[in-house]
Amino acid sequence: MVPVNNSPVTIARRGLMLVISSPSGAGKSTIARNLLEKDKNISLSVSVTTRPRRQSEIEGIHYHFISKRDFERMRDGDELLEWAEVHGNFYGTPREPVEAAMAAGRDMLFDIDWQGAEQLQDKMKADVVSIFILPPTMTELQSRLHRRAEDSEEVIKTRLLNSRAEIEHWRDYDYVILNDDLQAAFEGIEAIVKAERVRRDRRHGMFDFVRSLLEEEPKL
C-alpha cells in the first residue's frame, strides 16, 4: 500500500558506532573520507590527540590537537569514551558529541586503532560495528607509507614495525576487508553499513510501526 502523501516510511533507530582500524598505510583514512563524502548520515568522531599536526591536517577536522595536560584532564574526568597511546602520542574520543549524535539517529565513524576499538566494544558493544582493513602485502604497505610523504624514514620504520602487532588483532573485529582494490574495499564497507542499519535491535521505532501496522484495517 502506497502512503497517501507518497513519502517513505521512516522508522526511528539509534545511531551506530562504525569503527574502522588498520595499520598505517592500509587505507582506512581514504576509505573513511570517501564514506563521509557519500553518506550524509555518517559523521566523523573527531579525536583529540597530543600528536603534532601534519601539514595536510586541519584542526577540528582531522583531530583536535591538545596538550598532554589537557588530555590527562579529560581522561581523568571520564570525558573520553576511549583513549590509547600510539607511537608515543595519546589519542582519545570525546564522549559528549558521540552520545548526542547517536541518540539523534546519526551514525558515528571512528578512525581508531585496536586499543581504542577494544575499549569501545567493552563499554558499548551493542552499538559498535568494527571493521579491520588489511593491506595485500607488507611490501605494498611500505610503498604506501613512502608515497604518502608525510613522515620521516624513522617514523615510517616505526610504523612498519608496529603494523605486524596491529594486524595480530584482526580476529577481534566483526568484519575484515582486504584492501587490494580501493573501490572494492569501499563497496564492501558500504554493504556492511547498510546491513547493520536494518538490524532489529537498532530500530527501536520498529515496535511502534509493527503495532500500528497490525492495528490497520484496510478498506475493502
Swiss-Prot record:
Primary enzyme class: transferase
Instruction: Tell me a GO cellular component.
Output: cytosol
Determine if Kinase is one of this entry's keywords: yes
Q: Where is the signal peptide?
A: none
Q: Domain named Guanylate kinase-like: which ranges? A: 15-194
Q: Which SMART domains does the UniProt entry name for this protein?
A: GuKc (SM00072)
> What EC number is given for this enzyme?
2.7.4.8
Assigned keywords, A-Z: ATP-binding, Cytoplasm, Kinase, Nucleotide-binding, Transferase
The answer to keyword Transmembrane applying to this record is no
Q: Which Gene3D superfamilies match?
A: Guanylate Kinase phosphate binding domain, P-loop containing nucleotide triphosphate hydrolases
The record's catalysed reaction(s) read: GMP + ATP = GDP + ADP
What is the similarity comment for this entry?
A: Belongs to the guanylate kinase family.
HAMAP family membership = Guanylate_kinase
Protein's recorded name: Guanylate kinase
Q: Which organism is it from?
A: Agrobacterium fabrum (strain C58 / ATCC 33970) (Agrobacterium tumefaciens (strain C58))
